[in-house]
Swiss-Prot record:
The gene is secY2. This is Accessory Sec system protein translocase subunit SecY2. InterPro entries: SecY/SEC61-alpha, SecY2, SecY_dom_sf. It comes from Streptococcus oralis (strain Uo5). Component of the accessory SecA2/SecY2 protein translocase complex required to export cell wall proteins. May form heterotrimers with SecE and SecG subunits. It is found in: Cell membrane. It is a multi-pass membrane protein. NCBIfam families: acc_sec_Y2, PRK12417.1. Keywords: Cell membrane, Membrane, Protein transport, Translocation, Transmembrane, Transmembrane helix, Transport.
Amino acid sequence: MTKFRSSIAVKKGMCTLFLLFIYVLGSRIALPFVDLNSRNFLGGSAAYLDFSVALTGGNLRSLSLFSIGLSPWMSAMILWQMFSFSKKLGLNSVSSEVQDRRKMYLTLGIALIQALALTTNLPVQAPYNPFLVFLLNTSLLVAGTFFLVWLSDINATIGVGGPVVILLASMVASLPQDIIQSIQVHKISLGLLFLLLVLGVLFTYLVVLFYRARYRIPINKIGLHSRFKRYSYLEIMLNPAGGMPYMYVMSLMGLPSYLLLLLQHLDKGNPLYSAMLEQYAMGKPLWIYAYILILFVFSIAFAFVNVSGQQIADQMKQSGDYIYGVYPGEDTSRFINRLVLRFALIGAVFNVTLAGVPILFVLQDESLLKVSMIPGLFLILSGMLFTIHDELQALRLNERYQPLF
């Protein structure tokens, strides 16, 4: 029992559970002076936005302190990665402290847009001043987002999983309700439900296969002298991006809806914003085609974010390691990037097939939207669980050795 309590994995796990308790507690703190019984805010878009916000730690169903979740921070990370590819901007030339500060400024700007779009459409209770309630709730929503960012950083330091745990908790809280509601609405028979369960098991097997499959590149290490093993290996996943592109796509694609809602409130006489909101609504053809295209592009882009040929080549050059038959430096970088691109295309096709193709059924029946999103949700869920599992395995590695005396 003493050994169990002294385990690093157990200590970090307990810290994570405590931080999750704080997250759940904060998600139950409702925004003040708001009519929680009204569901007609956001121009009727609440049901669609709630689905995407739930993937980023938010919840529009309860209108709480954490309603917009980590979505602004995730959108800021995507935009920062896009901007950093431009050498003219020189974003990577400054110190990491300056970069982190600028990322927070970008997060603040996006959080303000989302908070303003939400608070301008909230149903305020009659006796209170709408403007003061608007200022108060906007401040609370922005503060809630930054509190979640801080909570994620704390969990990354003393807990397990970093921000993934918060996103996982939000998904687990909303996913069962959406599945049960979809089964009730479409009156799925037991036979069809059994078939879906079989397909779910097959889907889980494919996800595990793609996540665990690795391509190993033999690396010659100067300091490695063993007649039993000449090489160490650089491993590249069959799907280098994993399931994370799906979640980031949902976060980024929700941003235009918030911006249009805010513009619609500022320019109420202009019918253009209402028409654009209607055409871009979740489940509409424009949204579906944009979603599939961005998912494909992000699956390739995130592969190069996770496996950077330039960084690996630089590290190998500094340590004196090399790939047999490939010159160190730029040749090694190009060799690795070609492999990453090849596997990124395989992963992109896999992600689009499992998380994108089912959404095409929504073109025939919009009520199938939540059902068609379930494969993508399981793709994210599997990736999160594997990430947490791998981190726990790494923490337990040092505990497998017993002291000599």
